[in-house]
Amino acid sequence: MQSIYGASREHYTILRKMPYALSFLHRQLFVKLPMPTKSFQGKTVIVTGSNVGLGLEASRWIVRLGASRLILACRNVQKGRAAAKDIQTSTGCSPETLDVWELDMASYKSVQAFASRVHTDLPRLDVFIANAGINSHQFQTFEKDEAMITVNVVSLFLLGLLLYPKLRETAAKYKLQTNLTITSSDLHEIAKFEEREAPDGQIFCALNDQSKFSGIDRYATSKLMEILLVKEIAAMAPLESRNVIINCVSPGLVPPSSR
């Protein structure tokens, strides 16, 4: 039986007894994840942040597993096309399998335009992998909020909620389960999230206080917020009635990649 960390039941028992840092190292050094084998035959998949790193490698595996159509959602279309060519070369897939669509998670207008295109141009949507995110040690704002909160939290869930009806429609039409999966991080464990103590309705104002900004804590906080929001949405949209699986995954420690 696989645990949420990809480990056996015995490994999971060991992990539960360890402090966070030790359990993290244990997973990194001793837990070997199985290669994916689930077929994506006939499925349409969207992966955001798919021109590099985790998004690129996830996209490559999805194509290897037989996806009929994969949308590479990228801020930079030119880099997205280079990624598509790389995937074609390594997998031998048909060029018609891959599409590159522009998506800038720092812009609500771009997020809304992307979602509108999905509803207009895609007959179905089986899997949405929300992988795009940023990690910065410098304070900056997008859409009047701190950048990591805008990109990693608000835009992510705006897009997820806009695409949810398409996932639900596909599940009902084809009598299967669809997926909304968010790339989170083990770093949520170390989030201080002191802004949660702000008065009602003032959390975002507190997060915009540059004098109290810490890059590493803000990134960890954004990942904690992802997990908390996924739990809330999953509770409001039970799998039994809608057949849309909503979850988070943690990739562990991976090498950084430039965007």
Question: Each predicted region: which residue ranges?
Answer:
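Cytosolic, low-complexity regulatory segments enriched in Ser/Pro/Gly with interspersed Lys/Arg
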Residues: 1-19
